[in-house]
Structures are given as C-alpha cells and as structure tokens.
Amino acid sequence: MSTAQVPYLNCIRNTLTASMCLQNFGSQIVERHNKPEVEVKTSKELVLNPVIIARNKNERVLIETSINSIRISVSIKKSDEVDVILAKKFVRFLQQRAENFIILRRKPVEGYDISFLVTNFHTENMFKHKLVDFIIQFMEDIDREISDLKLTLNARGRIVASEYLKNFA
C-alpha cells in the first residue's frame, strides 16, 4: 500500500467501524419480514445520511447506513483508458462470483464500480472489525491487482511491438 493511500483508507476504516452498529429491525409493513432498509428505503427515519469519502473525483467510497444494514459502494481508481478496461473486467469477474464473498452485491450502485451490503445478520455471525478489515484489504488488493495487470500488459505490449518491428529491420 502506498503512503498516499494510508489517510484515505484510515478514514474509510474509521467511518465503517463507527457505522457498523447495526441491530435487528423487522419490517413495519409486513409481519415477520426483515429486509435491509438501506435497500428498500420504506421509511426515512430508518435511513441515515450517506457519507462520501473521496480521494479524487474518480476514487471515492459511498457509505449508506440504516438501522439494520450498511451499503458500501466503491469507485476504483481509473487514471487512463487501460485502467478503465482492466477495472471493468476485474469487477465483472468478481461480481460473477458474488455468492462466494457473502457481502458482495451482484449489481453496484449507479456511478460506482463495486458494492457491498452488510446486514445485521452478518454482524451477528461475523466479527465487525474483521468485516471492516476485509473491505479495506479488498480495496488495497483491487488497486494492487489492477496496477500489476497494467504493468504486465505494458510489458507484453512492449515485447509484441519489438518483435513486430524486428521484421522491418
């Protein structure tokens, strides 16, 4: 992790830790139903104000909290067109395997690349600090993987170009 990312990730970690105070809350409309309020938004008093933590205009996190759920949406760093293509392919690969991640949503919030949904059942079954650590580690790993893929792609392109130009020499 680069030192420039540390304050950004610490801010996200602290905000997630503070907002993980979820509790069981049954539906006010249908008896014995418990749906994540951040998704259904049946009543305004149960949904808190969303928080956006941005490092720049392309790299930001949206944290939406309600009484029984929290939705974390991440926009991945995209500095050029190669990053955009790699991020899109990588996110699509992960979303196809969303059931393996438990808290990963198949469809992200509009304007973001990837989203997580944590409900009170997740916080009852798992440690809250481990959930926060997973999300932060996930963000670090995505950045690292995309950077590695970009380096590999550039090296491969350089090799292909040099082999092609050897034919003209």
Swiss-Prot record:
Subcellular location: Cytoplasm, Cytoskeleton; Cytoplasm, Cytosol; Cytoplasm, Cell cortex; Cell projection, Pseudopodium
GO cellular component: Arp2/3 protein complex; cell cortex; cytosol; pathogen-containing vacuole; pseudopodium
Pfam families according to UniProt: ARPC4 (PF05856)
Keywords for the protein's UniProt record, in alphabetical order: Actin-binding, Cell projection, Cytoplasm, Cytoskeleton
GO biological process: actin filament polymerization; actin nucleation; Arp2/3 complex-mediated actin nucleation; exocytosis; phagocytosis
Domain of life: Eukaryota
GO molecular function: actin filament binding
Quaternary organization: Component of the Arp2/3 complex composed of arpB/Arp2, arpC/Arp3, arcA/p41-arc, arcB/p34-arc, arcC/p21-arc, arcD/p20-arc and arcE/p16-arc. Interacts with carmil (via the region between the LRR domain and COOH-terminal proline-rich domain); carmil is required for Arp2/3-dependent actin nucleation. Arp2/3 complex, MyoB, MyoC, and the alpha and beta subunits of capping protein all form a larger complex with carmil.
Protein family membership: Belongs to the ARPC4 family.
Protein task: Functions as a component of the Arp2/3 complex which is involved in regulation of actin polymerization and together with an activating nucleation-promoting factor (NPF) mediates the formation of branched actin networks. Seems to contact the pointed end of the daughter actin filament. The Arp2/3 complex is involved in organizing the actin system in cell motility and chemotaxis, in phagocytosis and macropinocytosis, at late steps of endosome processing, and in mitosis.
Designated name of the protein: Actin-related protein 2/3 complex subunit 4
